[in-house]
């Protein structure tokens, strides 16, 4: 038996609409499902191992790439209407899933577009510039302060 790939990545957010502005409106992903679900009788909903405390409902948005060749995994953004969500985003050197990364063709141009749209870089462009004056990767913060990376992949030479 073996896993065949990553199905989805779920991110609990404080404000789903703000997160959708980032992932849909700024990054260009497509919402394929957006609904509020009653948590009563959901598998695992009462599990203290899975939830910090019992929740009444959750709002879920499945956010996909438009590229049919590289469509998976998709993102599942969840929030709990009328309830606070706990926790703080972690850094790259802390235990847990530290960030999500998206591939782009031109990181420097993409970074300039993100900054023009008001997205905060996690550092300056100089922080991401290598010895050859290339920018191949950057990190930004999503609306919940979660680190999001954009990279061009490994160099071709």
What do these predicted regions represent?
Residues 8, 97-99:
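Eukaryotic phosphotyrosine signaling hubs
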Residues 40-48, 83-88, 123:
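A short, acidic/glycine-rich surface segment
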